[in-house]
């Protein structure tokens, strides 16, 4: 497999996408995680984390398989240079996380995806029942025209997305991808 991971530079180390779990129950077409093997992804080093300013918790599915707020608290307290922690996940598992008492005390933003009707329904429910006011850096990626209806979606920048072929996929050029030790 050819790696597409960005090189560590003074610029890219400021934004670390940290795979906190490889586990996911979905089989999304053209999932970017199919572009590399787990062994290709380097572990985040102490030096990298000491230079990081924005940490993106990703997976797999972080809301399903990790305690994301506990992870955010750990990284922010251990590395005071980390100013923002943003969690990537799907709307269904985010709603389940909230319903189980999950909190966002140390999380600064969400990057949620709607990739199924179940995700769409969960996002509609979440914005009716939960206020995302404390989360300032939120994005909602909507696939397959599954835009939530009948609700306002405040505090989220909304992006309509199409599935990219794996040949077209490019990681953000201002970040590095690492896995958690």
Predicted regions and their residues:
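N-terminal [4Fe-4S]-dependent radical SAM core
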Residues: 1-18, 156-181
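Core AdoMet radical
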Residues: 32-40, 52-65, 81-96, 106-141
């Amino acid at each position: 497999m050819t790696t597409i991971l960005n090189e560590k530079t003074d610029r890219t180390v400021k934004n670390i996408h940290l795979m906190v779990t490889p586990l996911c129950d979905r089989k999304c077409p053209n999932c970017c995680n199919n572009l590399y093997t787990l062994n290709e992804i380097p572990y985040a080093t102490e030096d990298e984390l000491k230079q990081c300013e924005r940490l993106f918790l990703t997976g797999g599915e972080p809301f399903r398989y990790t305690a994301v707020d506990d992870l955010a608290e750990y990284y922010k307290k251990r590395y005071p240079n980390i100013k923002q922690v943003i969690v990537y996940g799907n709307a269904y598992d985010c709603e389940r996380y909230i319903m189980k008492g999950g909190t966002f005390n140390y999380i600064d933003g969400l990057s949620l995806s709607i990739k199924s009707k179940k995700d769409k329904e969960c996002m509609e429910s979440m914005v009716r029942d939960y206020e995302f006011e404390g989360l300032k850096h939120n994005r909602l990626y909507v696939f397959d025209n599954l835009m939530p209806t009948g609700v306002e979606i405040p505090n989220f920048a909304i992006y309509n997305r199409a599935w990219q072929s794996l040949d077209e996929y490019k990681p953000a050029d201002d970040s590095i991808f690492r896995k958690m030790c």
